[in-house]
Amino acid sequence: MKIVFAGTPEPAAVALEHLIADERIEVVAVVTQPDAKRGRGRSLRPSKVAEVAEEAAIPTYKWPSLKAGTESGDEARAVLGDLAAQGVTAAAVVAYGNLIPKDILDVFEHGWVNLHYSLLPRWRGAAPVQAALAAGDETTGASIFRIEEGLDTGPVAAQLTQKIGLEDTADDLLASLTYAGRELLADTLVAMDEGKAELSGQDDAQATHAPKIHPADAQIDWSQPAEVIQRVARAHTPAPGAWTLLDGQRYKIGMLLPSDPADVAELGPGEVVASPKKVFVGTGTGPLEITRIQPPGKKMMEAAAWARGQQELLAGRPTFSARETGE
């Protein structure tokens, strides 16, 4: 079958590579976000999807908007209409990042078919992986559904489930779901083309929402229970990174491990103490071990190494706080 692929970041590129390699599928065009400033030099660079498409010599379109009446939107309608006339029957979507108007959703016979990183209708929205981790879900998964005008509300064609490990971060979970989900996406597209796919409507009453993540969401409230704080840290690793404040400066916090209260003196929420090889912080229910920390202006490092250079500071048992200087 012939398809268009729409996506932008690294997980989408991983899915695109799989679809290109699948002999049942011909990716005839790719749609992605325009080049953006990335990296330390802040130079304009193509998306990860654009890089994969260009290496495979697949025509690539970088429309900034699909809105009717705009130059890029009108061009998109002409191009996609021509592709439909040439036998393209579906568009596969993975983290595209652009609103797709209804008339464009209707261009292809099987519509625009999206890989979403949750068991819909649970965790509709931009950050389903992070939401599942932060909520303490034990199981998550991926859904293949046909996009309609509502946010992640379309009928579901296929799903897979996956257990969430006790130390899984958002990065870990996103990677594993991408590799499993890309196979499900390919198989579902082919099933649609062969008339074998069965789509089921979602139960809106069971829907939960996962809005876009902002840095403020990753700030640690040390008065919360230890297990909640661990989940927040895992959900925001690697980006934007769980963080806290010490003397008005931001510190990013890496992996947090449970600690036996018998191993350390009683600590108040946010209170920090170091032993020769470990760093502990108090929470609302008991201590956690900080294994990695990123001080201001430095790279992430082992917490014990940081503590060895901060003996005078830590001797006073400082406390991570919740307000920045000037607030």
UniProtKB/Swiss-Prot annotation:
> A single Gene Ontology molecular function, please?
methionyl-tRNA formyltransferase activity
Give the enzyme's EC designation.
2.1.2.9
Per UniProt, which keywords does this protein have? Answer: Protein biosynthesis, Transferase
Summary of the function given for this chain in its UniProt record: Attaches a formyl group to the free amino group of methionyl-tRNA(fMet). The formyl group appears to play a dual role in the initiator identity of N-formylmethionyl-tRNA by promoting its recognition by IF2 and preventing the misappropriation of this tRNA by the elongation apparatus.
Identify its protein family.
Belongs to the Fmt family.
Q: Which residues bind (6S)-5,6,7,8-tetrahydrofolate?
A: S118, L119, L120, P121
The answer, when asked if Ubl conjugation is one of the entry's keywords, is: no
The region annotated as signal peptide is: none
Matching entries from InterPro entries are given as: Fmt (IPR005794), Formyl_trans_C (IPR005793), Formyl_transf_N (IPR002376), Formyl_transf_N_sf (IPR036477), Formyl_transferase-like_C_sf (IPR011034), Met-tRNA-FMT_C (IPR044135), Met-tRNA-FMT_N (IPR041711)
Q: Listed GO cellular component terms?
A: cytosol
CDD domains assigned to the protein according to its UniProt record, in alphabetical order? FMT_core_Met-tRNA-FMT_N, Met_tRNA_FMT_C
Which HAMAP family does the entry mention? Formyl_trans
Task: Return the protein name.
Answer: Methionyl-tRNA formyltransferase
What reaction is this protein's catalytic activity? L-methionyl-tRNA(fMet) + (6R)-10-formyltetrahydrofolate = N-formyl-L-methionyl-tRNA(fMet) + (6S)-5,6,7,8-tetrahydrofolate + H(+)
